[in-house]
């Protein structure tokens, strides 16, 4: 027997109906914000992801040579692919461009709670605006996307790469990206491992203490931003803190400030982020950390050969969100499969087929007996697959112009004229 590949999953109908519900809830919100759907190839040239994705992501690439000797990789995220799409074909398009996607990604990492080697994300990219209003629009959509699924007990933590860069300068660190990578891993490492990583990076005890103090500066904006003003003194940092104040004000206009906190220790794992970054956290007992995140990446498009173009976006981790929704009991009761099962008895398949066809054209999920089972076995099958109504099409009933509709939940049944089947089925399903 051939097993499925480690870190991947099969989704049965009962799981797919839940996933589709989540996808459609998020898709609906994306489109109400004016975003349009795109999809890029699952494979790109490996170089695309090596340029600015970050050391950790590059290590986890599913990369190989194709039969033509070209280096290709399965996408580990969509931002790089969408930026490549923009550079290829849309540099002269009206700005800002607002695109969204729902797609699968691949990373070779150790499977654990909420982490798989194939996983799905729903995200957006807003390309062509460097205004703080664009950041606010994207973060507000980030919040509303989670709210659309019924989730309310979450926090969106906002950090800033500019402030982390200034912090690195204050420590005398030249490799600011290296420091950010370590800070980004802080929640994945034990305290001992984190301190060891900072020491191996070259920080002395004083520097390590400053890092530990920095990552504790988090909370509501009114509490944190004044502390940031005390900590950072450079003009660049002051300008960025002013932008954060402005961002928080705009988010209050969107009526999402209830979910917003500032966390100066957020770095995010991709090297392409340039200023504001953010992630969503839900308190849970499942061992799941961030359920999504994003930020501004103003240099990525230029790195890929385009004209300098600002951009911002986010991705929601579907494999992390759905377990949270299930754990909190927020997914509705959803049924996969047909509501009606039509059973021809004897020489009545022509009428049975006509009935199931009318039901389907009326938008009623219907199936028909295809295996030649006798009535009792056909009813047993209908019960086992969870069908609500069974329509028994018998020759004697047809001589009187009727069929029998049996409610498999209550056991009640009723004779209905053939021409009235669709109306009666709708009535019974709505009871």
UniProtKB/Swiss-Prot annotation:
One cellular component term from this protein's GO annotations in UniProt: cytoplasm
Broad class of where this protein is predominantly found: cytoplasm
CDD domains xrefs: HisRS-like_core, HisRS_anticodon
Protein name: Histidine--tRNA ligase
Entries under Gene3D superfamilies matching the protein: Anticodon-binding domain, Bira Bifunctional Protein, Domain 2
Protein family: Belongs to the class-II aminoacyl-tRNA synthetase family.
Enzyme Commission identifier(s): 6.1.1.21
GO MF entries: ATP binding; histidine-tRNA ligase activity
UniProt xrefs under InterPro entries: aa-tRNA-synth_II, aa-tRNA-synth_II/BPL/LPL, Anticodon-bd, Anticodon-bd_dom_sf, His-tRNA-ligase, HisRS-like_core, HisRS/HisZ, HisRS_anticodon
Source organism phylogeny: Archaea, Methanobacteriati, Methanobacteriota, Thermococci, Thermococcales
Keywords of this entry: Aminoacyl-tRNA synthetase, ATP-binding, Cytoplasm, Ligase, Nucleotide-binding, Protein biosynthesis
Residues that span the membrane, as ranges: none
SUPFAM superfamilies noted in UniProt: Class II aaRS ABD-related, Class II aaRS and biotin synthetases
Catalytic reaction equation(s): tRNA(His) + L-histidine + ATP = L-histidyl-tRNA(His) + AMP + diphosphate + H(+)
Listed PANTHER family: HISTIDINE--TRNA LIGASE, MITOCHONDRIAL-RELATED, HISTIDYL-TRNA SYNTHETASE
Source organism, top-level taxon: Archaea
Cell compartments where the protein resides: Cytoplasm
GO biological process: histidyl-tRNA aminoacylation; L-histidine biosynthetic process
Pfam family, one: HGTP_anticodon
